[in-house]
Design a protein with these regions (language model features):
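Short alpha-helix adjacent to the SAM-binding motif of class I
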Residues: 81, 102-109
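Thiol-based oxidoreductase modules, predominantly thioredoxin-like and allied folds used
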Residues: 88-102, 112-124
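Short pre-active-site segment immediately N-terminal to redox-active cysteine/selenocysteine motifs
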Residues: 58-60, 64-68, 136
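Short, internal strand/loop/helix patches
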Residues: 108-141
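Bacterial Sec-dependent N-terminal signal peptides
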Residues: 1-24
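N-terminal "domain-start" segment that seeds a small globular fold
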Residues: 20-54, 117
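Conserved redox-active cysteine motifs that mediate thiol-disulfide chemistry
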Residues: 64-81
């Protein structure tokens, strides 16, 4: 009886506390997602669509990260190495930092200011991130 009770508790816990698996069958972004505004390092507001058009026809990896995210910081050396070994691949970094100042400090602290960086000034919950079911960082999209 104890085993059955334990199994039921484990099953309920796994069901209640499990994360939603993102839908992976999306092949195109919605108009709302592409219209999402992001801020470049020089303060210019662009849509996600404008950023993607700059890399049209090329292999592009979008790295979703934040300076407060330990796993994101640990992944930076690997993405740097991947970038160096594969110059044909282009990288864009989308930050989910809570403030513009945190983002800018993170770029300098982790020495990635020379990369193509953008910040979601509307925060985590925005049309683009909602469309891709972003629920954790780091996340990479190819």
């Amino acid at each position: 009886m104890k085993k059955i009770f334990s199994l039921v508790i484990i099953f309920i816990s796994c069901t209640v506390f499990s994360q939603k698996v993102p839908a992976v069958n999306k092949t195109l972004f919605s108009k709302e997602a592409l219209a999402q505004k992001i801020t470049s390092q020089n303060g210019k507001k662009l849509s996600v669509s404008e950023v993607l058009k700059q890399h049209e026809g090329k292999i592009l990896i979008i790295d979703f990260w934040a300076s407060w995210c330990r796993d994101c910081i640990l992944a930076l050396p690997s993405t740097k190495e991947l970038k160096e070994k594969n110059p044909e691949i282009e990288f864009v970094y989308f930050s989910l930092d809570r403030s513009h100042d945190q983002w800018k400090k993170g770029l300098e602290k982790y020495q990635i200011a020379e990369n193509e960086n953008y910040w979601f000034d509307e925060g985590w919950k925005n049309n683009f991130n909602n469309y891709i079911d972003l629920n954790w960082v780091p996340r990479f999209i190819i």
